[in-house]
C-alpha cells in the first residue's frame, strides 16, 4: 500500500513538472456587485465562436481571480455562472499570436430569482474543490430528495453511512456541524438529520479548517448552506415525503423579500425511521467457565425533529443586521426485540441453556430553543469590514430513558431494569471578526471567540423485584453531575494572491477550562490548558486549467460528556456502559495535497491525505459479569491514515453525466493500552459510481452504486459491503411541482458485519436493513414574480436544472 501511494505521488508530481508554468492568455477576477466581496465559487466558461460547448472551464481562487492559459488563437466569449447571480456573458474578444486579455474586475449582479425559476439552468457539478474545502451541490442529487443532509452526503467521496445510519468521513465520525456558519442545535449525524435536503443549497466539507474555525472535530467541519435567493415579494416551498419504512417528513419555507429587508418562516415535522434485522453471537471466557450468547431479532430507530424557525434581516448600503430564532422538540429513539439463547458452561459441568426475549426501549430527547444576532459593517468596497455575532441555545426537559426487560417464551417477566437521566443544557457563543485588506489581493483577518457549554442533571436506576412485582430504585446507583466547558479563542490569518500563487497562513490560541462534578466519590475533575493551533493553505494555478492545493491543519477532539460519565448504564441486559472521567483529548495533524484538472465540461481531481492522531479515543468492550459485556471509552494509542481520493466527472453526451469517486487509504493503529487490544492495520477503500440521465425536459433518472471496503479497530474488524440505488424525478406545472421516487439498496446487498476477537471475548454482529426501502417525495415551489426573460437567451445547453 505504501509503495502504491509513493508511486501515485510520484506520478502526480511528474504531471505537475510536465505542466511547467506559462504566462496567462486570459484573466480576470469576480466580485459581488453589491458589496464588493471577492467571489470564489463560480463556474467560468470559455466559448469559442460558433461553438455551443465550452473549450475550457475553471473556478476562481480565494481572491476571485481566474486564469486561462494554453488557449489557441481565435475569437472567444467568456461566461460566468453562479447560483443567485445574473449570468455574465462578455462581448466577443480576439486572441492573436502574442495577445493577452485582462478582463479586469467582473461585477456579478445578485439575481432576484425565486425557488421555482429553474429555466435558466444546466447541470450542476456535484463536487467542487476549493482552497480550504470541498463543496457538495445538493439539488442535483436525486437520492437526497425528501431526506436530509445525510442523504445528500451519502454520494460524496470518502463518506460512509454505517448500519445505524451514522455518517463517517474517512473512517471518523469526529466532525462539527454548522448551519449557515452557526453551530447546529444537535451534534454529529443527528445534526445532519435535522436539515431537510430540499432547503439545502450546498454543503461545505472543510477537511483542513483554517485558524478562523473551531479546532474541534477530528476530520473537520461540515457547514450546511441553506437556500436564500428569492424573488422580491412572497416566495416559498413545501416538501412532503414518505417511505415504505414509514419514514415521513413535511417541511416548508416562506420568504418575503423587500428592497432592503427580508423575513422568513419555516418548519418541519420529521420522523426518520431505520429498520433492520440483527444477529449476535458472542462468547466470554472467565475463570469459572464460558458464557455463550446466540441472539437475533428486529431493531428500529427514529431520529425526529418537530420545529419552527424564523428570521429577519436588514441590508443597508454598508451595514447588515440579522436575527434568527428556532425552537422545537427533537431527539432519537431505539427499540429492539431480540431472542437471546444463553448457554453457560461452568466448572466443568454440562452446558445449561436458557431462552429469553429481550425488549429494549431507548429515548434521548429535549425541548430546544436557539437564537442568534449578527451584524456586519463595511468600511469601504475593498473588503475592509468588521462583524460580530451572538448565539444562544437552550435545552430543557432533556431526558435520556432506557427500559429493558427479559421475559420467558411464555411472556412472563424474568427480570427488568430502567434508568432515567434528566438534564438541563445551554450553550453560548460570541464572535468578533475583523478583516483588513493590505493590498488589492492580500488581507489580514483577526478575531476573538467565546464558547461556553453547561449541563446539569441527575441519574437514577430501577431494577425489577420479582418478590414485590415492582420496579424499585437503586440508591447506590443515584448520581448527580455538573459539567462546564469554557473556551476563549483568538486567531489571526494572512492570505494573499500573487499571479498564480495563493497562500493562507493562520494561528489560533485557545484557553480551555473543563469542570466535571459528580456525587460519585473521586470522580470529579477540573482541567485547564492553553494550546496553539496553526494552519496553512497553499494554491498554485497551472496551465491547461490545472491547479494544485496544499493544506495543513492541527486540530483536537475534546471528550464529550457521555465519554466521561462515571456511572453504569445498560443498553440491554447483556450490554453495560460506563464513562471514563480521565479520558484525554485527541490531537490530530491533518495534511492534504489536491490536484485539479478541467477539460471542457469535464473535470478530474486527486487528493493525497495524511492524518496522524495522538491519544486516539476508542470504545473498548470487555467481559463484565457472566455473559454481560462492558463498554467504555479509552485513549488506546496512536493511529495513522494515508491515502488517495480521486474524483472524475464526465459529460459524454448532452443527456448523460457520470461521476466516478474512489478513496483508498492505509490505516494503522498502534495500541498502547493493555485491554485486549492489539496493533492493527488495513487497507480501506470505497468506490462510488453516480450516473445522471436526462430523459426529457422535465424528467431525470439517477443510478448509483457504492462499494465499501473492510476496516479494522484495535479489537476487531468490519467486512466489506456494496449497494445500489435508483431514483427518478419528474417536474410538472412549469416545474413548480416535483415528484421524486427513490429506491435504496435495490438488490438488498447492504449488510454490516463486525467481528471482535480478544483473549477473553469473541463477538460477531451482523446487521441487515429491512427491504424494500422506497421513498416518495413531492415538492411545490411558488413565487410572485417570473424569471427575467433575458436570462433564457443566455442559457446554453439547457439540461434539467442547476447551474454548471
For every predicted segment, state its role.
Residues 25, 242, 246-274, 289-336, ...:
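Transmembrane beta-barrel wall of Gram-negative outer-membrane proteins
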Residues 31, 43-47, 81-83, 100-142, ...:
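Short, acidic, small-residue-rich periplasmic hinge/interaction motif at the N-terminus
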Residues 49-65:
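Short, acidic Ser/Thr/Gly-rich low-complexity loop/linker segments typical of extracellular
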Residues 105-106, 149-151, 167, 190-191, ...:
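N-terminal periplasmic accessory domains that precede
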Residues 149, 155, 182-208:
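Short acidic/polar hinge/loop motifs at secondary-structure boundaries
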Residues 224-237, 277, 281, 294, 513-515, 544-590, 610-631, 744-759, ...:
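Surface-exposed extracellular loop regions of Gram-negative outer-membrane beta-barrel proteins
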Residues 296, 418, 427-431, 472-479, ...:
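Outer membrane beta-barrel strand-and-loop segments of large Gram-negative receptors
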Amino acid at each position: 500500500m505504501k509503495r502504491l501511494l509513493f508511486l501515485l505521488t510520484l506520478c502526480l508530481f511528474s504531471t505537475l513538472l510536465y505542466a511547467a508554468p506559462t504566462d496567462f492568455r486570459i484573466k480576470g477576477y469576480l466580485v459581488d456587485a453589491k458589496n464588493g466581496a471577492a467571489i470564489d465559487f463560480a463556474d467560468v466558461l470559455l466559448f469559442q465562436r460558433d461553438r455551443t460547448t465550452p473549450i475550457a472551464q475553471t473556478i476562481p481562487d480565494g481572491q476571485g481571480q481566474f486564469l486561462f492559459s494554453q488557449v489557441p488563437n481565435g475569437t472567444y466569449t467568456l461566461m460566468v455562472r453562479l447560483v443567485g447571480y445574473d449570468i455574465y456573458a462578455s462581448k466577443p474578444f480576439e486572441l492573436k499570436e502574442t495577445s493577452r486579455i485582462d478582463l479586469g474586475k467582473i461585477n456579478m449582479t445578485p439575481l432576484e430569482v425565486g425557488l421555482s425559476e429553474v429555466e435558466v439552468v444546466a447541470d450542476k457539478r456535484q463536487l467542487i474543490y476549493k482552497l480550504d474545502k470541498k463543496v457538495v451541490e445538493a439539488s442535483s442529487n436525486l437520492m437526497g430528495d425528501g431526506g436530509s443532509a445525510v442523504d445528500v452526503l451519502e454520494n460524496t467521496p470518502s463518506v460512509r453511512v454505517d448500519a445505524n445510519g451514522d455518517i463517517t468521513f474517512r473512517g471518523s465520525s469526529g466532525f462539527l456541524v454548522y448551519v449557515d456558519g452557526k453551530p447546529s442545535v444537535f451534534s454529529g449525524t443527528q445534526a445532519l438529520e435535522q436539515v431537510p435536503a430540499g432547503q439545502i443549497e450546498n454543503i461545505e466539507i472543510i477537511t483542513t479548517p483554517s485558524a478562523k474555525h473551531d479546532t474541534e472535530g477530528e476530520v473537520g467541519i461540515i457547514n450546511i448552506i441553506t437556500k436564500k435567493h428569492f424573488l422580491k415579494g412572497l416566495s416559498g416551498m413545501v416538501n412532503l415525503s414518505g417511505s415504505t419504512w414509514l419514514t415521513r417528513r413535511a417541511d416548508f419555507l416562506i420568504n418575503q423579500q423587500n428592497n432592503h429587508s427580508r423575513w422568513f418562516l419555516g418548519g418541519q415535522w420529521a420522523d426518520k425511521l431505520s429498520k433492520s434485522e440483527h444477529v449476535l453471537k458472542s462468547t466470554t471466557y472467565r475463570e469459572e467457565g464460558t458464557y455463550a450468547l446466540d441472539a437475533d431479532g428486529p431493531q428500529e430507530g427514529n431520529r425526529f425533529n418537530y420545529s419552527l424557525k424564523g428570521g429577519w434581516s436588514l441590508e443597508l448600503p454598508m451595514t447588515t443586521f440579522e436575527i434568527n430564532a428556532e425552537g422545537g422538540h427533537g431527539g432519537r429513539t431505539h427499540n429492539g426485540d431480540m431472542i437471546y439463547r444463553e448457554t453457560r458452561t461452568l466448572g466443568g459441568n454440562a452446558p445449561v441453556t436458557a431462552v429469553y426475549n429481550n425488549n429494549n426501549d431507548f429515548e434521548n430527547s429535549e425541548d430546544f430553543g436557539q437564537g442568534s444576532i449578527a451584524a456586519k459593517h463595511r468600511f469601504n468596497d475593498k473588503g475592509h469590514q468588521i462583524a460580530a455575532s451572538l448565539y444562544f441555545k437552550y435545552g430543557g426537559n432533556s431526558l435520556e430513558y432506557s427500559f429493558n426487560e427479559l421475559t420467558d417464551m411464555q411472556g412472563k417477566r424474568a427480570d427488568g431494569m430502567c434508568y432515567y437521566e434528566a438534564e438541563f443544557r445551554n450553550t453560548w457563543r460570541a464572535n468578533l471578526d475583523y478583516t483588513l485588506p493590505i493590498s488589492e489581493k492580500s488581507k489580514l483577518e483577526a478575531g476573538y471567540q467565546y464558547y461556553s457549554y453547561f449541563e446539569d442533571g441527575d441519574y437514577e436506576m430501577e431494577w425489577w423485584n420479582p418478590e414485590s412485582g415492582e420496579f424499585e430504585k437503586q440508591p447506590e446507583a443515584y448520581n448527580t453531575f455538573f459539567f462546564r466547558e469554557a473556551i476563549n479563542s483568538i486567531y489571526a490569518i494572512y492570505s494573499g494572491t500573487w499571479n498564480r500563487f495563493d497562500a493562507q497562513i493562520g494561528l489560533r490560541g485557545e484557553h480551555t477550562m473543563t469542570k466535571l462534578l459528580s456525587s460519585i466519590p473521586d470522580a470529579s475533575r477540573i482541567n485547564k490548558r492553553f494550546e496553539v493551533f496553526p494552519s496553512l493553505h497553499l494554491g498554485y494555478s497551472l496551465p491547461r486549467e490545472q491547479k494544485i492545493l496544499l493544506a495543513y491543519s492541527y486540530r483536537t477532539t475534546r471528550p464529550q460528556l457521555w465519554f466521561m460519565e462515571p456511572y453504569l448504564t445498560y443498553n440491554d441486559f447483556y450490554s453495560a456502559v460506563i464513562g471514563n472521567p480521565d479520558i484525554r483529548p485527541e490531537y490530530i495533524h491533518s495534511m492534504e495535497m489536491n490536484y485539479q484538472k478541467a477539460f471542457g465540461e469535464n473535470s478530474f481531481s486527486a487528493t493525497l491525505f495524511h492524518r496522524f492522531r495522538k491519544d486516539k479515543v476508542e470504545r473498548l468492550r470487555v467481559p463484565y459479569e457472566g455473559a454481560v459485556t462492558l463498554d467504555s471509552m479509552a485513549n488506546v494509542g496512536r493511529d495513522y491514515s494515508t491515502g488517495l481520493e480521486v474524483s472524475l466527472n464526465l459529460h459524454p453526451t448532452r443527456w448523460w453525466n457520470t461521476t466516478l469517486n474512489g478513496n483508498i487509504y492505509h490505516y494503522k493503529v498502534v495500541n498502547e493500552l493493555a485491554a485486549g487490544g492489539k496493533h492493527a492495520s488495513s487497507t480501506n477503500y470505497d468506490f462510488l459510481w453516480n450516473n445522471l440521465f436526462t430523459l426529457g425536459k422535465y424528467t431525470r433518472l439517477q443510478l448509483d452504486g457504492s462499494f465499501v471496503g473492510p476496516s479494522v479497530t484495535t479489537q476487531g474488524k468490519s467486512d466489506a459491503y456494496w449497494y445500489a440505488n435508483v431514483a427518478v424525478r419528474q417536474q410538472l406545472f412549469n416545474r413548480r411541482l416535483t415528484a421524486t421516487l427513490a429506491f435504496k439498496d435495490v438488490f438488498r446487498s447492504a449488510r454490516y458485519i463486525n467481528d471482535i476477537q480478544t483473549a477473553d471475548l469473541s463477538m460477531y454482529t451482523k446487521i441487515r436493513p429491512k427491504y424494500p426501502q422506497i421513498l416518495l417525495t413531492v415538492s411545490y415551489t411558488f413565487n410572485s414574480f417570473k424569471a427575467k426573460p433575458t436570462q433564457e437567451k443566455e442559457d446554453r445547453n439547457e439540461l434539467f436544472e442547476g447551474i454548471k
